[in-house]
């Protein structure tokens, strides 16, 4: 059951902790809804302030009391009057001392007096429903919070300021203009005849704009969500040691027993400002062990969907049949051959053509790691390098743009075949509907649930 459906959204006053739980200097508690000021009057006291006539956007001092009149904490608080607030509703922010007991007692008091604990992302959801932001800006707020690199933060900030939203509005107005020309031709064809060539050129321009956005979307997505990288190789080649070396922490178990890693282990790192999500996978070999087979299957799936693979080889054994077996499985992927254990190897076998551009390292000592990082960056340069960006930062956004392009291409093809204008207008209207869903003009509760459930409770 979703308690946000129906009239509950407008009636309920919600409360939540907006800072991370735990011990800290200051904690922030948010209240939003039409009873925000009433709850403030019941719980916060300051003889010099009349809560009923509280000046908005001004920081005030006071004491927070529970429902029995017992003091909980000395606080500061700010009142934001509707609609000039984050949510578009009456809001109060309470700044209390950080600590689990203090914040819990304040929130418990507000709940007892009629507030409801906010759901994930409900403050931002209300901001959207009250017309303060569109869905793209709502997504950008979450991306700012989760940003792992300077580039991803900049993209998210650009979209919060309206970069992608403005481009979508341009597309929308262009399609409305084309639709108007078609409707004029249909309704007043005897008096006003808009040339089909003009309509066709307008649609081609829209499709070209969309094509560019979609073409460069991968770059925005990689910057926003991170570049994926997998370590593959035969058992006991040093994959877990390399993962720990790259992450500068012990995330994976390191032993001399082949096949120790059976599940995919993931970590995150930055190399010169580029955010990577790296996976350590099970050792790949021919085996009859059912459990190990499952791990190997997971390893291959993880590797093949990654942006770059580190193909780890053992410098002490040279290129083996097991290595050749793995090579044949990943040869069509973007991979970097990496010779490990150079600290204990006598020589490195670089005679094989596809290994001539390999990197030589010791995951144990750290030798060659700088060269490996440079090689990794070079292999994904096209995905993250500076240049044209589409500011498409989520798969949802990309999917909607592809749907719009599909409808515009249909309209263009129909126009070239001299199909009736009223048929062509259907495809254009479908494209407009997709743009409106992308921005949030049209939405379903399931769509909102999917987006805002990723937020923390206090946002």
From Swiss-Prot:
Cofactor comment: Binds 1 potassium ion per subunit.
Main location: cytoplasm
Record has tRNA processing as a keyword: yes
Gene Ontology cellular-component terms listed: cytosol
An example Gene Ontology biological process: tRNA methylation
Sites where the protein binds Mg(2+): 240, 261
Positions with a binding annotation for K(+): 236, 255, 257, 260
UniProt-annotated location(s): Cytoplasm
UniProt-recorded Gene Ontology molecular function terms: GTP binding; GTPase activity; metal ion binding
Keywords: Cytoplasm, GTP-binding, Hydrolase, Magnesium, Metal-binding, Nucleotide-binding, Potassium, tRNA processing
Record Pfam families: MMR_HSR1, MnmE_helical, TrmE_N
Keyword check for NAD: no
Residue ranges constituting the TrmE-type G domain according to the UniProt record: 226-381
Cofactors: K(+)
Enzyme Commission number(s): 3.6.-.-
Record-listed GTP binding positions: 236-241, 255-261, 280-283
Function according to Swiss-Prot or TrEMBL: Exhibits a very high intrinsic GTPase hydrolysis rate. Involved in the addition of a carboxymethylaminomethyl (cmnm) group at the wobble position (U34) of certain tRNAs, forming tRNA-cmnm(5)s(2)U34.
PANTHER family in UniProt: TRNA MODIFICATION GTPASE GTPBP3 (PTHR42714), TRNA MODIFICATION GTPASE GTPBP3, MITOCHONDRIAL (PTHR42714:SF2)
Name under which the protein is recorded: tRNA modification GTPase MnmE
Organism the protein comes from: Fervidobacterium nodosum (strain ATCC 35602 / DSM 5306 / Rt17-B1)
């Amino acid at each position: 059951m979703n308690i946000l459906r129906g009239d509950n959204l407008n009636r309920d006053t919600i409360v939540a902790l907006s800072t991370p739980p735990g011990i800290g200097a200051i904690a922030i508690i948010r209240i939003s809804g039409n009873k925000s000021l009433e709850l403030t009057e019941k719980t916060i006291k300051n003889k010099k302030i009349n809560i009923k006539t509280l000046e908005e956007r001004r920081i005030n001092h006071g004491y927070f009391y529970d429902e029995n009149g017992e003091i909980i904490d000395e606080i500061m608080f700010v009142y934001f009057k509707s609609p000039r607030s984050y949510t578009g509703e009456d809001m109060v922010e309470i700044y209390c001392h950080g600590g689990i007991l203090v914040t819990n007692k304040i929130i418990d008091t507000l709940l007892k007096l009629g507030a409801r604990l906010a759901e994930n992302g409900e403050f931002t959801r209300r901001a959207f429903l009250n017309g303060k932001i569109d869905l793209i800006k709502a997504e950008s707020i979450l991306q700012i919070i989760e940003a792992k690199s300077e580039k991803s933060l900049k993209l998210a900030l650009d979209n919060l300021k309206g970069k992608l939203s403005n481009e979508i509005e341009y597309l929308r107005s262009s399609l409305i203009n084309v639709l108007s020309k078609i409707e004029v031709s249909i309704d007043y064809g005897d008096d006003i005849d808009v040339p089909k060539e003009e309509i066709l050129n307008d649609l081609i321009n829209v499709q070209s704009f969309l094509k560019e956005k979609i073409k460069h979307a991968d770059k925005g997505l990689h910057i926003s969500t991170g570049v994926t990288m997998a370590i593959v190789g035969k058992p006991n080649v040093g994959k877990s040691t390399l993962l720990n070396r790259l992450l500068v922490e012990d995330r994976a178990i390191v032993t001399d027993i082949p096949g120790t890693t059976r599940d995919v282990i993931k970590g995150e790192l930055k190399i010169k400002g580029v955010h990577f999500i790296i996976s350590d996978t099970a050792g790949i070999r021919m085996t009859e062990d059912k459990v190990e087979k499952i791990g190997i299957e997971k390893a291959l799936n993880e590797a093949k969907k990654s942006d770059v693979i580190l193909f780890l080889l053992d410098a002490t054994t040279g290129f083996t049949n097991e290595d050749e077996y793995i090579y044949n499985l990943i040869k069509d992927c973007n991979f970097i051959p990496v010779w490990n254990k150079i600290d204990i190897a006598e020589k490195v076998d670089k005679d094989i053509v596809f290994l001539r551009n390999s990197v030589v390292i010791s995951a144990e000592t750290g030798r060659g790691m700088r060269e490996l990082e440079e090689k990794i960056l070079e292999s994904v340069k096209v995905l993250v390098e500076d240049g044209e960006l589409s500011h498409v930062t989520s798969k949802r956004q990309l999917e909607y743009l592809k749907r719009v392009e599909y409808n515009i291409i249909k309209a263009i093809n129909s126009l070239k075949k001299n199909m009736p204008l009223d048929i062509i207008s259907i495809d254009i209207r479908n494209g407009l509907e997709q743009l409106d869903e992308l921005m949030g003009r049209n939405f379903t509760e399931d769509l909102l649930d999917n987006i805002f459930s990723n937020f923390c409770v206090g946002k």
